[in-house]
Amino acid sequence: MPQLRLILVGRTGTGKSATGNSILGQKCFLSRLGAVPVTRSCTLASRMWAGWQVEVVDTPDIFSSEIPRTDPGCVETARCFVLSAPGPHALLLVTQLGRFTMQDSQALAAVKRLFGKQVMARTVVVFTRQEDLAGDSLQDYVHCTDNRALRDLVAECGGRVCALNNRATGSEREAQAEQLLGMVACLVREHGGAHYSNEVYELVQDTRCADPQDQVAKVAEIVAERMQRRTRLLAGLWGWRKFYWKGWRRGFSVFLGVAILIYLLFYRKGFGDQNNR
């Protein structure tokens, strides 16, 4: 039976869990309005759709600048990879209509760090609060927005956008799911039915074991080590940049001082010669 593996990504508070419930047609993920996120761990749920087994992975706060605090051991990041192995067919980047903020951009950067920039070719931008369009076209909204970061994101995703009203029920909710899953199915066919993969997913396949928790722990160690190595590399590059900039400023100051001194010497000499005449 063919599968559609989907991962809900984006910053916390955009309605990822509610979006997952809309796709699945029932309440599988805990979803509640509030300032404090309710999703604490990556969770997998599935449904049948048009002969496909659709598997949806809901994610907690692992796509923000607070990752060192929210997922210090990279356990939930590793769980996301394990649950979506051998790789997702699409990422659903969830954002709220009219509220694409700096936090959304930071979440996007985190998605690229974790999955690789190439994953944008497998990404669909999903806007929640479709009802706020009030009957207007989503395409017109995206085309006319003055939010440059949002326009760039949509372009990077090949224009794949969809809007959901997560309060919809019954036939309206199912029609929304049909539209989104149909878009994902077309995306999968464009890639010859193949799922997305990267080095981490290959490592997940190599660390398969009987106990899923043991596998998550092993993958978490690998991911944490990679992130620490990247942090050390960036710190080294930043230190070199500061050293270079400091040295350049010092050298420029010396050069400028010498130039001024030479100018003053020649200027005074020339001025004195004019007076002697």
Curated annotation (Swiss-Prot):
Function comment: May regulate lymphocyte survival. Required for normal levels of mature T-lymphocytes and mature B-cells.
Q: Which GO terms describe its biological process?
A: B cell differentiation; CD4-positive, alpha-beta T cell differentiation; CD8-positive, alpha-beta T cell differentiation
Instruction: Tell me the GO molecular function terms.
Output: GTP binding
Lumenal topological domain residue ranges: 267-277
Query: Where this protein primarily resides, as one coarse class?
Result: endoplasmic reticulum
Subcellular localization, as worded in the UniProt entry: Endoplasmic reticulum membrane; Golgi apparatus membrane
Q: Give the CC-aspect GO terms.
A: endoplasmic reticulum; endoplasmic reticulum membrane; Golgi membrane
Q: Where is this region: G5?
A: 165-167
Which source organism does the UniProt entry give?
A: Mus musculus (Mouse)
What name does the UniProt record give this protein?
A: GTPase IMAP family member 1
Family to which the UniProt record says this protein belongs: Belongs to the TRAFAC class TrmE-Era-EngA-EngB-Septin-like GTPase superfamily. AIG1/Toc34/Toc159-like paraseptin GTPase family. IAN subfamily.
**Segment G3: which positions?**
58-61
Which residues are recorded as binding GTP? 10-18, 31, 129-131, 166
